[in-house]
């Protein structure tokens, strides 16, 4: 599903990633852990085509995305990869439903179909009655579930999450973590999650440990 080979990345004189090789299978939920500065977020951004490696290749479902032109890459990203961040990044002027629909509009989906897709996902999240509410009317846990719904709207094969539960309380963290597994079981998606949450890392299918820009071998 996801294959990284020889990934390097430097910012100025600082080498952040030092020849990363990593394969992630379809339907896996993989956590990436390690100390701050280990290169976790940079690796996730390269995996999600938000940044380019200095060297090496990134392939998703057999497509070598690291060789794509920007326009082609943007379309591929919007269709095949969903992103969830620590802070929900919902647009405050739009309702929960409208926020979820935005990536579908970008992909050229009709308003009717986007609405149907969004309502179906919000229903699965238990948020049907919150669809018309704006972000400032939602709880922290609800906002993050809306952000997950937005990541799912185009039925991506891969969900990449960077500290998705970092701003949530214990109860909402547990609910969000369970949601990832429910989604995987229902939709067969692949999840890669950067986290400092030991509880989440323990229940994922596999944990990748990073230290100083490398993957630590067990």
Curated annotation (Swiss-Prot):
Subcellular location: Cell inner membrane
Highest taxon of source: Bacteria
Location, primary (coarse class): membrane
EC number(s) recorded for this UniProt protein: 7.6.2.-
Membrane topology: Peripheral membrane protein
InterPro entries per the UniProt record, alphabetical: AAA+_ATPase, ABC_transporter-like_ATP-bd, ABC_transporter-like_CS, MacB-like_ATP-bd, P-loop_NTPase
Family annotation (CDD domains): ABC_MJ0796_LolCDE_FtsE (cd03255)
Limits of the ABC transporter domain: 2-218
Keyword RNA-binding annotated: no
Family (UniProt): Belongs to the ABC transporter superfamily. Lipoprotein translocase (TC 3.A.1.125) family.
PANTHER family per the UniProt record, alphabetical: ABC TRANSPORTER ATP-BINDING PROTEIN MG467-RELATED, LIPOPROTEIN-RELEASING SYSTEM ATP-BINDING PROTEIN LOLD
The protein's name in its UniProt record: Lipoprotein-releasing system ATP-binding protein LolD
Gene this protein is translated from: lolD
